[in-house]
């Protein structure tokens, strides 16, 4: 049986009004901005920040590229054939740009994100109609790039890793990233120093860098003032956070989480993505001591084979991961885990794959993401010998996902008949239905009053579906 806490720390119902700067209605004569976002939660956050930094230039969000004076395509380099997907989308946007040009309207087209960082020159060679190419570390320079693009005959490209940190120059966040602002993402760390053999992140996002504590707390308070009840802290390697604190010392993620938990109105804190090597004793203790820190942790392991973990340059063994899980569960018995797995890394044998399946059986995951290995140009694994055949990778992925699906179903089954605190974020698909999330990020649907949106209330889970739960309210009002 899955153990549950029936209540969480819940903030006062009355939230302070969102500051006047949040008046985001477009001014007369303003210009439309359409942002297309692919990839991770950090890209969602980055897109919001690019929107913020362009507001002083008169740009406001619009729903379609056809009505936009500027279009930003914020890209992701993680998936296979990521660059080709970008060029396909750029072909569509070229038609939009040309159609607007026939009507005497200009469209500034920008490509941002990790594909822009990795393929900047190739983008301009194959898509010369693109006006701006910028990497993830130069968003604070976007207004300057727009001005340069207006003056220049050619495109502007900025994919440097500048000495200054962009967060020192970006304005405070202006808009939440979800309808109603009940949940928000907050980037606190970027880059990675681990150099896993399969991963492009160190090359596209750069070295690990952390925002100062004061900057993080200021933005978090603003999010809460604007209605956020839950904040997810983001970073490529978020538990490596080492920001400068107001006391002049370096703060780790545990100390930052403690400070965030003290913000009135912030009921839930999450963080992603973590590396096992940076899950220190202080952070484990924070899961024990901070009720606002949700008992659901995404902790990628990638493989259960020590030989493959070494080939991946993960810096830990399968036994290290198992021991870490035991320490987490000892500190927080109700914690649940999700993870990432890659099948078919170069050199992976049947025995290596079986070791991964055994680790999954031993640990037990509430959720997981799994992928076939695909080479990323410039990474060590791309040129490694003993590449695994595609049909073998397909079979292994199918077997692994079947095991993970069984575990996810079992975890969700364990909630049926139990009372779970649910943060309601909006309406469900059916009339009179509300939708929210459990502490374990499970979607939960109930019938209830709109007054519960933005609040936490107890729900008795009655039924489990493939990817969601349904139940009935135990109480008709939020608890404090």
From Swiss-Prot:
Please give the name of this protein: tRNA-2-methylthio-N(6)-dimethylallyladenosine synthase
Please classify the protein's predominant subcellular localization into one broad category: cytoplasm
Q: Write down the EC number.
A: 2.8.4.3
List GO molecular-function terms, semicolon-separated: 4 iron, 4 sulfur cluster binding; metal ion binding; N6-isopentenyladenosine methylthiotransferase activity
What catalytic activity does the UniProt entry give for this protein? N(6)-dimethylallyladenosine(37) in tRNA + (sulfur carrier)-SH + AH2 + 2 S-adenosyl-L-methionine = 2-methylsulfanyl-N(6)-dimethylallyladenosine(37) in tRNA + (sulfur carrier)-H + 5'-deoxyadenosine + L-methionine + A + S-adenosyl-L-homocysteine + 2 H(+)
Q: How is the co-factor bound, per the entry?
A: Binds 2 [4Fe-4S] clusters. One cluster is coordinated with 3 cysteines and an exchangeable S-adenosyl-L-methionine.
The protein's matches in PROSITE patterns, at most eight in alphabetical order, are given as: MTTASE_N, MTTASE_RADICAL, RADICAL_SAM, TRAM
What the protein does? Answer: Catalyzes the methylthiolation of N6-(dimethylallyl)adenosine (i(6)A), leading to the formation of 2-methylthio-N6-(dimethylallyl)adenosine (ms(2)i(6)A) at position 37 in tRNAs that read codons beginning with uridine.
Q: Does the keyword Transferase apply?
A: yes
Q: Is Ribonucleoprotein among the key words of this record?
A: no
